[in-house]
């Protein structure tokens, strides 16, 4: 009986760590031929997962774009030059950008729970500068 309990508990805890799909995204001045970029433009996670943004180079942050998050999500804007994280509890698409570099195309999407129900809202955002083209490419890839 004791062995069975140990096996059950071990299986449970091992499966929990396998199911965890937290993601890490670097905030960078350059990646390949691109300038002012996040290392991943789109990440897909489950409800309850956390995304960690790492300030690998100075001058960057993460800001949820107004109108670009599911209903019920509060404003989120990290300080410049700081690593930050956000635990995603509400399913949907989250559009974000680097506040100082949004016009240079430093944007990304997080898709939570494979829920794309707010895609029409994401399409209505007034993206700036180079972000317009990148957002269109990201939206078309969803």
Put a short name on every predicted segment.
Residues 7-15:
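Bacterial N-terminal signal peptides
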Residues 19-142:
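Extracytoplasmic copper-binding redox domains, predominantly the cupredoxin/blue-copper superfamily
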